[in-house]
Amino acid sequence: MTVYVDDVRHKFGNMVMCHLWADTLDELLAMVDTIGVQRKWIQGHPTLSFGKHRHASWVHFDIALSKKALAIKAGAVLTDKYGPSEHTAKLGIASGDPARAERGQRMLDNIARCRAMFSEQPV
């Protein structure tokens, strides 16, 4: 099982944020405890999240770049900007729901096309 952090930069007030998620809730909560992020900031969980954060499409934390560095040092795997979409697609495929599995596979196919397209562009 793995904890992941993506390579994005989203401004939030004076902070720059990215996403942290994991294969299991226990791993995710252990990582935020390790890096000093309060559990109350979890998003997408039906009971642990609060308010509008409960309705996020996947269970994750938005973390500051300083916490990202700590997460990587603690063993989190760095992904590209497609990491969260890839994760949710795989959840859909594993769900046992044929419609979700089909959507998940289409999403993985689209991600593969995007990655290929961007890897072919000169820097």
Which residue stretches match the model-derived regions?
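Catalytic phosphate/metal-binding cores of nucleic-acid and nucleotide-processing enzymes, i.e., regions
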Residues: M1-P122
